[in-house]
């Protein structure tokens, strides 16, 4: 097991990772200023955390954490199998789709951070966590209002509503969902009668401010996950205070409300006129396409983050027009995981969620009294999962769901251990009248492991960021030689190849564009972007155009433009 020094450092790493991954953006260095920097930081902190955990992994397999260790090990092993057996490009699977970055690296990092958070979770750490949550929430409430007022300091462009807050997530739906989570935490903290009235009013005000930002986003996701999270908190509060009849009644009302919301997704029931809209309708098509992918690829899916590569082949013919013509996500985290890694991967993911639920039940049964910090954590976890049913796994949000899961599982285990007296006592050094807690330093073995973790983490995190930053600089320099050089920097990815080819086409250098497209389609034969660009080049040979159009008919069979 981890010693005190390692555990404290691991806790700091987790909290730092949460802050950095949520807030980091890179607007002046990348064409993808939101997704890629979050992936780089997520990977870096996960590897550093792993360097502290790995030396104790054998002991953890024999500890109370063994169920979680086994589930996460199976999850990672299935991802490794998918990488080699799904048939998709290894590089594309490792880093994930452009702007989404939900590849093997991201899920490995999320799994490591979930486990790490479970090791450090206890009553004191959960308090620290909730305080950090509220600070991040306050930052994004302020930033969201700055964006709403048209005072955005960064040169972002959105395809959605003008001035709708996007926070540090790149999409108003994500900002809305995150504000729903923050509102849940703030309102739960306001329930604590141990706080002074002014403090409780402050929490309630923060919750209301979060709801105001949800309104500004013009996205209903935040309302739904806030109501769901707060409803669960209210039910658990009633159970804790012995009001089981009221709790059952509240649970019944919550289930009825949830059922009406579910019907509204299909344009049915009294709530349909408030919830159902074009973007909701399109999600039904996305989910149906995901289901068909899973049926045809049940064991290893279509490859990590490969939904976009296959979507056009599985979409309904009715979806060949409008903004929903193409998507690279099922807009449902469970469906995205299922299509990425098959039935096994999504089953393990569901098993982790079940383990969280069992942990919540066990803690509530202990009748330890009202702990607002724990209930806020549970409410936030449930709010996150509600939004995950209709949203994309944006890494700035994804880290919250995985860390919250680890915190709840670890809280149950670590407080259980403490109750049975199995926790090692803190070493106390008595000097005179006052007792001083001795400071434990990292062992030499831990320092070496940590140094290796920082080095390896940097080696994994920096390359994708570096090559995309070089490409961004080359694009804005209009130096075609620099563009060509940056296009082929490793790790190579499909989007840089398509951007590079488009740059040459725009400068009437079609032969160079064709050379890039030839290389690109050899590496990514299922790339819709590369083949469609090639099919539109007038200087291409008739046979090349015919080949490109034939490939587009294969990749986009319901598009009448390729008939």
Regions found by a protein language model. Give the residues of each.
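Short, hydrophobic transmembrane alpha-helix segments
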Residues: 25-39, 56-61
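C-terminal luminal/periplasmic domains and tails of membrane-associated envelope-modifying transferases
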Residues: 443, 451-453, 475-563
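Hydrophobic alpha-helical transmembrane segments in integral membrane proteins
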Residues: 265-278, 443-481, 495
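A juxtamembrane structural motif centered on a specific transmembrane helix
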Residues: 1-3, 193, 367-370, 405-465
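TM-adjacent membrane-interface loops and short helices in multi-pass inner/ER membrane proteins
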Residues: 117, 171, 284-327, 334-337, ...
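Alpha-helical transmembrane segments of multi-pass inner-membrane proteins
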Residues: 2-28, 41-54, 72-76, 80, ...
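Transmembrane alpha-helix boundary signature
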Residues: 52-63, 80-95, 148-152, 418
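Flexible juxtamembrane loops connecting transmembrane helices in multi-pass membrane enzymes
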Residues: 164-168, 226-230, 256-295, 325, ...
